[in-house]
Amino acid sequence: MTIKDLYQKARIKWSSLYEGDVIHILIGTATCGRAAGSMAVLEEFKRCISNMDVPVSISEVGCMGLCSYEPLVIIIKPGNVAICYHHINEQTVPQLVERYIKNDDPCLELALGTVVGGGGEPVHIPELELFSYQQRLLMRNCGYNSPLEIDHYIACGGYSGLARALRLNPAEIIGEVEKSCLRGRGGAGYPAADKLRHCYMSPGDTKYVVCNADEGDPGAFMDRLLLESDPHSVLEGMAIAGYAIGAERGFIYVREEYPLAIHRLQTALAQAVEKGVLGSDVLGSGYKFDIEIVRGAGAFISGEETATIAAIEGRRSWPRHRPPYPSQCGLWGRPTLVNNVKTLAFFPLIISKGGDWFASIGNGKDTGTVLFALAGKLVNTGLVEVPAGTKLSTIIFDIGGGIRSGKQFKAVQIGGPSGGCLPQSLLDTPVDFDSLRQAGAIMGSGGIIVMDEDNCMVDTARYFLDFCSKESCGKCTPCRDGIHQMLGILEDFTTGQGDLSELDRLERMAEDMKQTSLCGLGKMAPNPVLTTLRYFRDEYIAHLVEKRCPARVCKELTAYYILPQKCYRGCDHCVLACPAEAITGDDNGLKVIDQAKCTKCGSCELVCPPEYNAVVRLSPVSLVPPERRSKTSL
């Protein structure tokens, strides 16, 4: 069956969503939606419509990236524009059913926007401020199409890129990718066309394509969202890559911690084979391409391409020296193309729309769009897709909505645990590979963590280095021992130990480690240390010289103190919450924290009524008046 035949049949099914007589309810059930309660919402909708006379269908869709607005529900009612509702729960479902599905009140107070522009209220979703700066290529289908329905993907142009690729020769496909100037989105930014060409030129009858979906960065979930929301875009990209290099087999290496992504990939694979877009005769062309899913154990190091190959082969995930590169000697000694999920998902768009079209997007240095996972102290967290070269300030303040609770911005950590921490003065940095590298950060897999005045940069560097120390494979000495020694120094700093000479030693160790480590983990792990030393050196000095943590985070340098003038209510909230029984009352009923007993868990600060706000953190600890350091000192 040709792609034209598949498209015509799929379009009929797709059109019924917006043009038929059935009321359609689309519920976002990606992992983020499920964490917010979307499955309970799904069951409540089923219960509420079970006795209705009018036809109603319920479908699961992926995530459109608005994770902080979940659960999201789209209701498509014949004769009305499709409306997306946010923060839906079991209590609001009956309202939507009674007021809108059964009647004509669209419940605008619950609406985020319309899916298809219709003018008036509510606003069209792409016109929302957090969307207006975005350009959605990879996420074009996410949250609107069902990942469990291949016809939805085909009806929106899916597999047309593969159909065009099959009419081209490998050199022409590689030429289109070269014109696009696409750089790999796995972190290193290597030109995608060069990888394809090297693998195509490598001699051998057996070659492989590997999709590296081992996403291990804290706070990163771009690959997971794509696999859960639009798995066919990745499968199509793998088939195009396989045809370009002469491979008949592909592997998706995905961590076991992504069960929903695995399930939806399995469903998509089965449907693709059934439709003939994968398998023994792809779209009737005679080309054969099969894909297998390999589950990983979740080690961070497995994301390094040679470690990924070792894991697929059933060996320990240890990186190896390069050359030879995987394009020369990869999986089972055969030429292998290893690409990230996002890189592969771009191939269908580049082939169907042309490399020049793709190259026109971006800032000239880098092309196309970049996918980022926004996390941390932001109003809007989730996934965003922006043209390469967009400023960090636009992503954080215009799309992310700025810092929560009126706090002050302090830093943004970009690039995962091996990325750098950049200060406010660098918020105009464009997000392209070279600009970020010049600033001391990396694009990485696309994680962005925003920090405010309550984050300690010394402790932040310690946290990321601690993560890398646990995830290091231990194969090379610079990484294994270097991280351990640097971590020890940082742990001393967070307790006020050490002197200023240690800063230079720490910097030298970090630079040596970058130069001598075997793989990217060891080479990049010092980045948080080097950038915090470069941009936040004053915080290190405060810890070492003043024995003070400016953010009042480091426990050994911080004390909890109850302000007598604010504790006039004399309640027992803090007394009851303290696990160490360190809080007692004086003769006037005012509370005192015994500093010797206090474990600095912060429970007292959490439970103190906000109208009193009597519990504060002080640093250095000498700020606590001597007469109020324990009940006996009164």
Predicted regions, residues:
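Ferredoxin-type iron-sulfur electron-transfer modules in oxidoreductases and energy-metabolism complexes
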Residues: 2-22, 38-60, 77-109, 160-177, ...
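Gly-rich Lys/Arg/Thr-decorated short loops/hinges at beta-loop-alpha junctions or inter-strand turns
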Residues: 26, 145-160, 211-223, 326-331, ...
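Conserved phosphate/anionic-ligand binding catalytic regions in large, soluble enzymes, centered on
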Residues: 29-37, 158, 177-199, 298-310, ...
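Iron-sulfur cluster-binding cysteine motifs and their immediate structural context
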Residues: 71-73, 478-484, 572-592, 603-621
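Flexible inter-domain linker/hinge segments
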Residues: 111-179, 333, 339-354
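Hydrophobic alpha-helical positions that pack around
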Residues: 130-134, 262-388, 400
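Accessory "access/gating" subregions that flank catalytic or transport cores
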Residues: 162-203, 358-360, 365, 373, ...
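Short amphipathic, charge-patterned alpha-helical segments
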Residues: 237-241, 389-404
